[in-house]
C-alpha cells in the first residue's frame, strides 16, 4: 500500500493484552514459532505430540513459561495472530519455472508465501538499515506485530528486528535441507538524525557540501527519546537480536560472520570508535549443510575467493571492500560478498534467492558462478536496474 513519510519516534507502547474471546485451534509448529520454543519443548509443556493442535489455554500456558521469548509477534498479540492465521485463505503458489532466473516485483513477506517448498540452495541478501535511508517506490506492509510501515522504517529497532525475523520465518520453507541463508545486516545507533535518500547525500552533508538543510527541512527525521530501555546514542545490537530470534524459529545459527570493510563512511568520534564492520548471519535448517571451503582458495577474488590480505583459512572474519554504491540503489553490497556466500554453499545449476534484490548484485554473482537465481524487490525502479545489470553480466559470458 502507498506510504506517506512520517518521522521515526522510537516510543515503546504500553501493551494491554486481551486474553478472552479466542476459541481457535492452532498447529503446534505455528505456536512454537511465535513462542520461541522448539516443537518438542512445546509438546512437553502442554502434554501433546508434535502433530497435535493447541487451543488458547495451551498458548496461555506457554506464554507463562520462563522459556518464552518473543520472535516476531509481541506477547500481547500472539493469540490474535494465531486466530488470523487459522482464518487466512490459501494463496496461489508459484511454480519452479516462475522462480527461475526471474525478477519478481512485490513485497518479500507476501511473495515468499507463494513460493514452492525446498527449492533454494542458498538465500543471500543485504537488508535495509533501520531508519537510515529512504528508498525509491517505498510501500507499506502490515506486519504480524500490527505495525504498518515499509521494511526499514519501523518506529522502534525491535520492530525492525521482528519484521526481519518474520521474513526469515516465511523464507524457511523455501530452503533445501542442506541449504544456507546468509543474512547481511548492519547495526545502528539510537540517535537523533535525519533519514536521507542515500549514502552520498550523507557524505556531502558531513563535508558541508550541497544544499544545506536544517533538521526540520528533512522529510523524515528519527528521534531518540521514548524507548523503554535504549538511551540516546546507544548501539541497538540489531544483528545479534535477529540472530538470537532466528535460532528460536528453529534455524541453526552456524556463524555470525564479521564483514570488515577496507574503508567505511566517516563518523563522529566524540564518544566512541567509528564503525567499519557489518555482520552476515549464516543460518541453516539442519546441523550439517553443504560447505565448499575450497571455493575460498580456488575462485577469483572478484567473485568471492581469497583476497591477498585475508588469512589462509576460511574464517568468520571477511575483509572485503564495500561497493562504491553507484547507480540508483547505492548499496554497499560488493559482488564478492554474495559471490563467496553462493560459492561456498552451492553448486553449478543450483537456485539462489535474494529477497531484497536491489540493483541485482546477488543475481550477477549467481550468473557468473553458473547458478540460477530469483530476485524479489518491492521497487519497480530497482527491479529494472537489476534486470539491466543482470543482462549485462549475462552478455559478458558469451
Features from the language model and the residues they span:
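A detector of low-complexity, intrinsically disordered, Ser/Thr/Gly/Pro/Ala-rich segments
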Residues: 2, 33-36, 51
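Short helix-start
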Residues: 10, 20-25, 29, 48-86
Amino acid at each position: 500500500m502507498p506510504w506517506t513519510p512520517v518521522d521515526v519516534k522510537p516510543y515503546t507502547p504500553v501493551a494491554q493484552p486481551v486474553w478472552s474471546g479466542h476459541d481457535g485451534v492452532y498447529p503446534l509448529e505455528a505456536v512454537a514459532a511465535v513462542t520461541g520454543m522448539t516443537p518438542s519443548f512445546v509438546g512437553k509443556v502442554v502434554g501433546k505430540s508434535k502433530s497435535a493442535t493447541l487451543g488458547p489455554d495451551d498458548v496461555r500456558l506457554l506464554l507463562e513459561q520462563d522459556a518464552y521469548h518473543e520472535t516476531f509477534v509481541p506477547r500481547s498479540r500472539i493469540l490474535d495472530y494465531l486466530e488470523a492465521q487459522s482464518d487466512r485463505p490459501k494463496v496461489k503458489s508459484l511454480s519452479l519455472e516462475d522462480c527461475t532466473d526471474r525478477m519478481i516485483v512485490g513485497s518479500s513477506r507476501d511473495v515468499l508465501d507463494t513460493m514452492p517448498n525446498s527449492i533454494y540452495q542458498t538465500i543471500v541478501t543485504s537488508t535495509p538499515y533501520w531508519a537510515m535511508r529512504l528508498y525509491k517506490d517505498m510501500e507499506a506492509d502490515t506486519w504480524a506485530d500490527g505495525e504498518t510501515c515499509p521494511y526499514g522504517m519501523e518506529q522502534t529497532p525491535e520492530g525492525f528486528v521482528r519484521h526481519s525475523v518474520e521474513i526469515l520465518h516465511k523464507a524457511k520453507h523455501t530452503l533445501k535441507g542442506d541449504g544456507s541463508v546468509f543474512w547481511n545486516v548492519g547495526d545502528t545507533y539510537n540517535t537523533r538524525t535525519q533519514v536521507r535518500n542515500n549514502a552520498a547525500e550523507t557524505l556531502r552533508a558531513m563535508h558541508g557540501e550541497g544544499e544545506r538543510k536544517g533538521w526540520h527541512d528533512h522529510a523524515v527525521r528519527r528521534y531518540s527519546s521514548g524507548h523503554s530501555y535504549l538511551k540516546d546514542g546507544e548501539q541497538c545490537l540489531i544483528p545479534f537480536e535477529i540472530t538470537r530470534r532466528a535460532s528460536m524459529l528453529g534455524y541453526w545459527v552456524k556463524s555470525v560472520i564479521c564483514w570488515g570493510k577496507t574503508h567505511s563512511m566517516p563518523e563522529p568520534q566524540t564518544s566512541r570508535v567509528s564503525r567499519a564492520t557489518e555482520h552476515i548471519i549464516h543460518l541453516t535448517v539442519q546441523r550439517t549443510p553443504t560447505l565448499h571451503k575450497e571455493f575460498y582458495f580456488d575462485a577469483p577474488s572478484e567473485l568471492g575467493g581469497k583476497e591477498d590480505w585475508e588469512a589462509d583459512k576460511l574464517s568468520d572474519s571477511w575483509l572485503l571492500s564495500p561497493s562504491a554504491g553507484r547507480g540508483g540503489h547505492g548499496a554497499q553490497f560488493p559482488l564478492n560478498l554474495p559471490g563467496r556466500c553462493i560459492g561456498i554453499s552451492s553448486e553449478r545449476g543450483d537456485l539462489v534467492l535474494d529477497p531484497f534484490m536491489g540493483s541485482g548484485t546477488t543475481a550477477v554473482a549467481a550468473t557468473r558462478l553458473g547458478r540460477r537465481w530469483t530476485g524479489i524487490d518491492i521497487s519497480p525502479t530497482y527491479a529494472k536496474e537489476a534486470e539491466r545489470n543482470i543482462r549485462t553480466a549475462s552478455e559478458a559470458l558469451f
